[in-house]
């Protein structure tokens, strides 16, 4: 199957159609930028400034520490951190040591964490002191061998580093003297063992850099194997698309979580490669973000619709100057047209929608920032990327405006799923990645999402898998049947709703089910609404009609 690539005629002259295939490691971009911009600020974190030389030095210290403690090439290291300097240092440090970074969400429950770490066969976990109880549980279960603990205060400037412990609501005591193989990040940084570091030989095309966990139709998380070449190719595509910038001179607002592959590529790797300053925020708070933009003047602001909506709806918006922002690439969920228009009016910059998935490192499409863009569209394929609409009915590529499954091809497409050859074969066919998203392409090569083939709920930029939520709630003794679906939400795009049938004579209310769900699921996966029914709509063979429930919900939403 070969597409005609009509989108190339729409490319601005500054964007190349094809890019050279990168044949170097991911960590080489840090080495290169540290050589070009040694004294330039790479990270700004609540007043703390770290240069590119600082980041490289600390990453090499961590790499040496990991090797001295037994890490071998290909060993998996879980990085369970919010956006902070240690996240960046850990990422490149693990890569310098020859390890594989396992992206781990700090919001995971112990149950979710255990599954991922067992599946990836992780040997080391790097995490916050506040998350130590989860980490030590994994060590007690013999899932991980070593724990590396850090604190937000480790990279705060004086006097914030002194005051921070006093403001913590949660106090965690860690006895480092009596517990073997538990180390502090700070002590690691004090050791001068970089001369002991042996940089392993890496094959960028085949060696895995990152295991990025994602779900599927079954809800069972799978490790997406992303090679050095996969991620670096996507980073270079990002640089080519965002061409109207000056290397070493931009500031990027780092709110999108780096444990999400979008933040990893479009913020962290992109900024490191081009010598940009990253202004890091561990979590999104609308007022704090407005203050940061007003004070630090970021020029680039990758995000998700919920972030932009949160800023636009804040009552104090008019008191802050957002005019420094030149361009924003929105991902993770559909960007409402009115949000795009209002945000561009407030900032004077450009806000465009893109599209991607973990299996593609992640970006495959975006609207042109300095060129034609179509509100409601996910845009055109990036350089060196092919895309098409596949018709299941004909087994051929669909014509313009014909609906089908979006398929993509390019150097950013994953190597496969970790230890799951059958699932890999199901989505990688004849060189194409079958995304599971349904849509169409217009005559100019702009693509549109029409529906989610997988019943994934995208709420606030997070992917939530109904089956996973259903299975967690099915453990409640009062539940007979349950189906979870994404329903319209003006802020999050979609939100999680559970339709429940209780066992005869059993009793349970919303509060009880909510508490039960919170004990088993990360907060963003917990249903925000419950509807109790006597029965659920089903087919003749007993399959629950999720689509029927969604249609009813959509009708009710429109009526409201």
Curated annotation (Swiss-Prot):
Keywords: ATP-binding, Fatty acid metabolism, Ligase, Lipid metabolism, Nucleotide-binding. It catalyses: a long-chain fatty acid + ATP + CoA = a long-chain fatty acyl-CoA + AMP + diphosphate. Pfam families: AMP-binding, AMP-binding_C. GO terms for molecular function: ATP binding; long-chain fatty acid-CoA ligase activity. Transmembrane segments: none annotated. Its EC number is 6.2.1.3. Belongs to the ATP-dependent AMP-binding enzyme family. This is Long-chain-fatty-acid--CoA ligase.
